A protein has these predicted regions:
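N-terminal interaction/assembly modules
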Residues: 1-42, 46-76, 105-122, 128-162
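Short, amphipathic alpha-helical "recognition" segments used to contact nucleic acids or chromatin
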Residues: 45-46, 53-54, 78-107
Length: 162
């Protein structure tokens, strides 16, 4: 008897379980977030989704720095810029924590001065306004990302309901 090759016509694996009601209801929001640019997606996933992926962290820092650099004075010393770069991720963390918790307390200027290895007076004269501006850049990213998500979501609802 010669063996005959026959291809299986069905898979022996179990079928995938159907989507839960929550996943189904949540999918339009997920599509809205996925339609954003990389930095906005990264911010929403980090701040509101708890995703700590390094690629998200770098995308957020690059977006915040470019937004901040566009609004900061052009005549900033190279040494100051180098120290400011070290504050970008800290400003992201501070704004994210403030968004999540009402009891969040801002870091004191003396603490931030110690992190940069500068005196408190130097912090107040040189770095404090930059710190405020950097946090404003993060808040602007937050607002733009949330509004863009809402806009995409509403457009999706309009398309579905029409």
């Amino acid at each position: 008897v010669t063996p005959v090759y026959a291809l299986e016509s069905f898979s022996r694996r179990r079928p995938a379980p159907p989507m839960s009601d929550f996943e189904f209801a949540d999918s339009s929001w997920r599509r809205s977030v996925n339609s954003l640019d990389a930095s906005q997606q990264a911010w929403l996933r980090y701040c509101y989704g708890g995703n700590l992926a390094f690629k998200h962290q770098t995308a957020i820092c690059e977006a915040v720095w470019s937004r901040y650099k566009g609004n900061s004075p052009a005549s900033t010393q190279r040494k100051v810029v180098k120290r400011l770069l070290s504050l970008v991720w800290l400003s992201v963390q501070a704004v994210a924590a403030a968004n999540k918790r009402e009891d969040f307390k801002e870091m004191a200027g003396s603490t931030l001065a110690g992190m940069l290895s500068v005196s408190r007076s130097t912090w107040c004269e040189t770095y404090s306004l930059h710190w405020v501006g950097m946090k404003e850049a993060v808040r602007a990213l937050d607002e733009v990302a949330l509004l863009a998500t809402l806009h995409h979501y509403q457009n999706h609802l309009d398309d579905v309901c029409v």
